[in-house]
Amino acid sequence: MKKWSLSLLLILMLALTSCGSEGGTPKWIWGNDSTKTTVKSRYIWIDAAANFPDYANSKDNIERDLTKVKNAGFTDIVVDVRPTMGDVLFNTSVVDQVKKLDVWEGSTYTYYTRTATWDYLQAFIDIGHSLGLRVNASINTFVGGCLYSYGLGEQGMLFRDNSKKDWATTLNMSSGLTNEMDLNTSNDPNNTYGTKFLNPANDSVQNFVLQLLKDLAKYNLDGIFLDRCRYDDLSSDFSDVSLEKFEDYIGEKVTNFPSDIMQPGTTSLPSTQPKYFKKWLEFRAKVIHDFIVKARAAVKSVNDTIKFGTYVGAWYSTYYESGVNWASTKYNTAAYYPEWATSDYCKYGYADQLDYILLGAYASTDNIYGSGEWTMQGFCVNAMTLLEGDVKFAGGPDIGNATGWVNGGQSSLIPETVDACINASNGYFLFDIYYVKEFNYWNALKTGIDNYLKTLK
């Protein structure tokens, strides 16, 4: 009986690791030398739009706040240099420079204009490095414009250049296949698709972003992180380009498009799945995986010392809706999520293509500690399993938008977020410096980080 039970156990273990090419002892992230303590990195995100009034025209403000960042105990900043409207805050010839961004002022949004001519990113690099901080840049990857609420109109590449309309993603809506550029206040009254996404499967789109990354890699950066390197949502992309590539991938024609893939208007996992539904999810994950491979190569071809990574949301159980598998190829997704993952879905996990991941462990104020998704600690614990030691990651909170955080006044909980995340991952990640300034969380962050550092002594 014991021998027979052991055999069954071995078979089960092999099944659960069927996507792994190594299948042996896992590469534990924290290393094999138990006597060596590695000090974990602490990252703070600097959103372009939210912080634009402070930094767009003032190096003094940048120095003021980066000094506070350093004093609070952070090791890294992540500077957003391509906001969701798709223009940039670094030197490149392939898209325009940001001139104005939407900012919250009083009780509404308005535009704030940049009049300075100095290099925005270079200022952060120079000041950050002088303070002993590592400086990373992030870009919103597959975006090309914004249609704003509050009557602000629109801006971005897709609105300036009609010839690029086919770069925009096509949605499988209940009203039919719809290019996002055809959505406006009448047919999208809630402005759900105000941020105009690009089609990740479009070769011209990919080449455009790859050139952006090559130009960005010319800077003396410590790292580059891709944000929104994904599909807009489950309903995208249903363009002719994507259909043709999908048919090539599966080796057959789709007779009834899009219904054989997904019924129009589907916004969540359907109870009855069309013929190609799960294969389509696999295909989208492959598109993103293959682009990540190209993006890494593009960055490293310019400067192979730059750390290459992504920002992702930690909610893996539903992240297939964005077309992203950020897990290890050794993690057999179908064994845990058979309702949406094929047996080949795990082949397109991209963790082993990265040097680092920033993980949005975004949970409410009453869900800091825990063991499952939608707790900060649980998000990080789960990620350890998902990543299988392929890449280090830093998890952390959104302290301005999640439930309980919106109105501030949570200084007592900030140290708990540090403790919960840094001890369950390889670092700490905080979104965003804007909320630290708004709610004056500097001392609370220093307390939390100091508490962690004391455990190393």
Q: Across the structure, where does each feature detected by a protein language model lie?
A:
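Substrate-binding cleft of secreted/luminal carbohydrate-active enzymes
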Residues: 340-457
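Substrate-binding cleft/loops of secretory-pathway carbohydrate-active enzymes
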Residues: 144-147, 151-152, 234, 302, ...
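Aromatic- and acidic-residue-enriched segments that line the glycan-binding/catalytic groove
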Residues: 89-102, 144-189, 228-268, 321-331
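Catalytic domains of carbohydrate-active enzymes, especially glycoside hydrolases
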Residues: 60-87, 219-223, 346-359, 424-428
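Bacterial Sec-dependent N-terminal signal peptides
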Residues: 6-9, 14-38
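An active-site-proximal structural segment forming one wall of the substrate-binding cleft
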Residues: 66-74, 124-128, 156-159, 196-232, ...
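Active-site-adjacent "subsite" loops/lids of carbohydrate-active enzymes
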Residues: 35-59, 137-219, 273-277
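Aromatic-lined carbohydrate-binding/catalytic grooves of carbohydrate-active enzymes
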Residues: 74-116
